[in-house]
Amino acid sequence: MSRWGASKRRTVARHAPLTSPTPLGQALTIAGVTATALLVAGGAVVAYFLYDLSASFAEDAVVLQDQTPLPPPEMGPIEGPFDLLVVGTDECEPELVAAIGPRCTGPDSMNELNDVNVLVHVSDDPRRVTVVSFPRDLMTPVPSCTQADGSTTDEIPKLQINTVYRLGGLACVTKTVSNLTQQNIQFAAKVSFGGVVAITSAIGGVEVCIGNDGMRDPFTGIDWPPGPRTIAGFEALQFLRTRHGVGDQSDLARIGNQQQYMSRLVRKLTSEEVLANPATLFRLAATAADNITPTESLADPLRIVQLALAGKDVPLDQIVFVQYPVLEDPYDRNRVVPDHAAAQGLWDALAANRPLQVAGDAGSNGGVIEVAPPETTDPSPSPSTGGTSAPDPVEEPVVLSENITGSTAEQATCSAGNR
């Protein structure tokens, strides 16, 4: 095994390798995960620049259903906890039609899917960030939704989550995820993937880690050796699309790989390399404005500043990426259903604003491996001296179900590469 192999690798529940989405559906992952990381760590980076870009940003703002009106935004961090849903859809943008082919020219070209669904929860005092990724093949109840023409849809007891967008757009996806998670989602953003790949190039790329003996995926054109690799542009697209190159080649394994990218992008966005470069900041802002359709609650640039200020100083070990817990669908081994018991522990911990401890693997279905931290020698304890004050008590974390996989932005993971 390469030195980029696992430091530990627990056995995890293995679901069937889920069917692969279309190339377009795979490609939109770039937008979803990049925009999520941008909103988690880069909100403060881009928010002030959005004043100059606010007209295009708010042009197609979406109204959320059944939402309590928010007070007008004002300078300073937003008060209290909040939830933001990031939805990535596989719309056929004109510049991508030729490259994508039949998906954008055939009978399914008008059926826009929400293949990326990521919930960002920011707690209050102390601030913590929890990023929850939902598998695209998750089967879930869908509530009645209002469509663009004002008509309403019927409730659906069980539907694949990535088909909800075409029923009622961003508002319907938000309502569905809100019902599933018991979270009051005040803000949401629909993300187009056209041009978002440029984010990694604009910041000089993101360094990821390829584990085991390297990564090979003929479907995305990857044939990379093990070790660190800085990816930007098309290589970032290849990395985030790959399913056959990681873990058990399932979409669940791919989520862990995407979370590695998000974690490393968060660290890049909060580094001085980005924060001290005005040209880079403006390029990031312009890309975000061009590729995000917000809800009306998020369309005011001052509101974005409020959200950004609330989360800008969260320590990396308090930014946690998790996969929503699932079980194999007993009626279809290529689909998954919610593990409500495991999820309830997560929602209870968020409601109580408790720190989280992920007991499961760093990624589902063997998608990533955690890199062993460097060995250090603890210094000998200093002799006790009288009159010293007691250290601040450390809050005990909530240990999540082992069926919840994930890691913090402080942890280092590598892709569990296949060759």
What residues fall within each predicted segment?
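Non-catalytic, solvent-exposed segments at the cell envelope interface
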Residues: 2-419
